[in-house]
A protein has these predicted regions:
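Non-heme Fe(II)/2-oxoglutarate
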Residues: 2-65
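Amphipathic alpha-helical recognition patches that constitute DNA-binding helices
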Residues: 4, 80, 107, 173
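A structural signal for well-ordered alpha-helical scaffolds and beta->alpha junctions
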Residues: 10, 14, 45, 54-58, ...
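Aromatic-rich, lipid-facing transmembrane alpha helices and their immediate juxtamembrane interface loops
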Residues: 12-25, 67-68, 101-102, 187-189, ...
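Non-heme Fe(II) oxygenase catalytic core, chiefly the N-lobe of the double-stranded beta-helix
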Residues: 18-22, 52-104, 110-115
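A structural signal for the main folded, soluble domain(s) of proteins
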Residues: 28-31, 35-37, 64-71, 77-82, ...
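Catalytic core of Fe(II)/2-oxoglutarate
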Residues: 87, 95-99, 103-104, 114-220
Length: 220
């Protein structure tokens, strides 16, 4: 199951997050402790990321998904702010399904790219496997202040197609993951991220995939 929501966050708050990002000098890559880096970007980023793991938003997700014990991950394990420049591409995959003795149940993607053109690609793809082939069921343009929410399971394949924006633009998204004590639609065993249909030629075209905020930060 999946849904797209439009314009549910204040535009001025997201504008503030973009301003925080633009003022932050970042390079590829330095690892920092998960969940403790948002303060490096600015007040707007802290306010938004605190809200995304806070009680009000999580209760909204519980009511939407009917997962009554849904919990946020305040450590932001594997999640955070993603900056994806021209040449970026994320192959279809299913996610790791367990963390801290809980089952991963819901993914939330909040897009931050302004004035994104359809021909620039970077569409969020949701799909399934038929035989040996990956089939795209739905594509979402990564438009500013749009949110895509989908259940996480052993068959919830997703990724994004090749980003072809100008060099001075980036595909930008905040990813958030939510967990439950109930297994849901997962298989019997825990699993790691599982990629399918890996296109090595398109992989070579990827200039770099710059992730920061929870896992990566600027070099001092």
């Amino acid at each position: 199951a999946h849904i797209k929501l439009e314009n549910i966050f204040p535009n001025d708050l997201l504008d503030g997050v973009l301003s925080d990002i633009e003022k932050t000098e970042y390079e590829y890559f330095k690892f920092c402790t998960v969940g403790n880096c948002f303060s490096e970007f600015g007040e707007s980023t802290v306010k938004l990321t605190d809200y995304l793991v806070g009680d009000e938003w999580v209760e909204f997700l519980r009511n939407m998904t009917e997962i009554k014990d849904l919990k946020s991950d305040k450590s932001w394990h594997g999640a955070g702010i993603n900056i994806e420049p021209r040449g970026s591409h994320l192959e279809p995959h299913t996610d790791f399904n367990e963390f801290d003795h809980m089952w991963r149940r819901v993914n939330v993607l909040l897009f931050l790219s302004k004035d994104w053109k359809d021909e620039w690609g970077g569409h969020n793809e949701l799909g399934h496997i038929e035989g040996q082939n990956y089939v795209v069921d739905r594509k979402y343009k990564p438009e500013f202040n749009n949110v895509v929410i989908f259940n996480t399971s052993h068959y919830s394949y997703h990724g994004f197609d090749l980003v072809s924006c100008p060099n001075d633009k980036n595909r930008m998204v905040i990813s958030c993951y939510y967990y439950s004590n109930e297994r849901g639609e997962h298989g019997a065993a825990t699993s790691t991220t599982n990629y399918v249909g890996w296109d090595r030629e398109r992989k070579k075209q990827k200039e770099y995939y710059n992730r920061f905020g929870t896992g990566w930060r600027k070099l001092k």
